[in-house]
């Protein structure tokens, strides 16, 4: 009888662990997280994400006058690679890949007009990506 209780307790603990993992995974999807380097990442279901820069980044940089994408859609990008160069009236900054990813889309509309990025950076994505693993955490 003690062995049966032991199995039941183990099964209950396993189920609780699985539920906790599922809740943590669900919390990551459809949620925006912020990096220490002033980028935001909005995770979506299916391993996708949008990446942009924060209001604070634009405040520090000043008016953004030019962006240059370093990769094309379909390219695989490794964590730490310079993905985008953002040039402002004060400086040029590189935005690095926060995790291994596949680039799905560059927001090429920004190449014609940077108004949205300067006025509402938290509503303006720079790239759409697909995460290559689930190891990204902040």
Predicted regions mapped to residue ranges:
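Short, Lys/Arg- and Gly-enriched loop/turn segments at beta-strand edges
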Residues: 85-97, 113-116
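Generic beta-strand structural signal
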Residues: 93, 99, 125-127
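Residue-level signature for short turns and capping positions that connect secondary-structure elements
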Residues: 56, 91, 108-109, 134
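Generic structural motif
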Residues: 38, 64-65, 96-105
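N-terminal chloroplast transit peptides
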Residues: 1-12
